[in-house]
A protein has these predicted regions:
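Charged docking surfaces used in two-component/phosphorelay signaling
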Residues: 16-24
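The C-terminal output helix
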Residues: 117-126
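Alpha4 helix (beta4-alpha4-beta5 surface) of REC/receiver domains from two-component response regulators
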Residues: 63, 86-103, 114, 118
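Active-site beta3 strand of CheY-like receiver
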Residues: 45-51
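Helix N-cap/capping motif at the beta->alpha junctions
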Residues: 31-40, 61
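Short amphipathic alpha-helix used as the core "switch/output" element in two-component signaling
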Residues: 40, 62-75
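Receiver (REC) domain active-site loop signature in two-component systems and cognate sites
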Residues: 56
Length: 126
């Protein structure tokens, strides 16, 4: 059974690019273009990993992460923040609030794929 990744980003080009690449690598991919949709899909689809953008309208990634962590149905889903915010304080905040990784945009595809595999290895050892 392939692992399911939920990609959350309000930029359609990034969403579609990641969906295409991750499917080519054998992952089952779901997408959401906003925070409310992400929360619904996380509960319904129970992905193995969520790649979550921070800067989104209406509900940003920080709020989504907080709500994922307090819901017992989604609290244990690994979340990797995926953001153009590159300051150390943002990376620290993401990790302190429960993200398993913080990936800065722009990212290299190879780096992203290695990080995803590393996350699945870490989660598998728990």
């Amino acid at each position: 059974m392939s692992k399911k990744i939920l990609v959350v980003d309000d930029e359609d080009d990034i969403l579609h690019f990641l969906e295409l690449v991750l499917r080519e690598k054998g992952y089952d991919v779901a997408t959401a273009s906003g925070g409310h949709e992400a929360l619904t899909k996380a509960q319904l689809e129970q992905p193995n990993l969520i790649l979550l953008d921070i800067m989104m309208p209406q509900m940003d990634g920080w709020e989504v992460l907080k709500l994922l962590r307090v819901d017992e149905e989604t609290a244990d889903i690994p979340v990797a923040m995926l953001s153009a915010r590159t300051e150390a304080k943002d990376r620290v905040q993401g990790l302190q609030e429960g993200a398993i990784d913080y990936i800065c945009k722009p990212f290299s595809l190879q780096d992203l794929l290695v990080k995803i595999e590393t996350i699945f290895e870490q989660v598998g050892k728990r």
